[in-house]
Amino acid sequence: MKQQGLGFESFEALSHDAGSQGIQAPVQLISGYLNADQQAALLNEVDTYPLTRPEIHVYGQNHAIPRTQAWFGNSGCDYLYSGLFVKALSWPKYAGKLREKLRRDFGITANGVLVNRYANGQDSMGWHCDDEPEILACSDIASISIGASRDFVIRHKASQQQYRIPLHSGDLLIMHSPMQDEWEHCVPKRLKVLEPRVNFTFRELIKHYHGA
């Protein structure tokens, strides 16, 4: 695989359909998409992000989510998910460069990124699908992992068939349409994991969906 420097230039990615691993789902895994220098630049930048642990309302009670997060995006790309309305913060330097890299390499035209930081294996994300109405229909969602390896588990809504996809630092997972219509996904707890993991999930939203 050709890897290039910190400038996030295009390169010839080793890409394969996850179906080659027996996973019959519209996902594409690119192992080692980011090199060590690129990962380090992003991790250093994450330390400056205004990460929060918001509360969501579930079954009549408020619960803090089991991770910290921040939403960055273009002007007019505010986001409502899990009952939380968040205003888009301005793009950080290296997250913005990564967005441009995804556009050059795969034609992904994201205008926002949700950053989730998992402090260790105690932090997690429950079953869900990224099907909010402000996400542009049939658009791809790109997910980049940095730090500790974690399992990404997908579950078919109709058959309940599950597949586990281990994601390692620097890996890129692209979820193609109709992934969000037919599948759910989660990041389960892994108590033996002691190191942090950061995930960047790039999405394309309908601009000004929630007004000016």
What is each stretch, according to the model?
Residues 1-212:
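Non-heme Fe(II) oxygenase metal-center motifs and adjacent flexible, charged/small-residue loops
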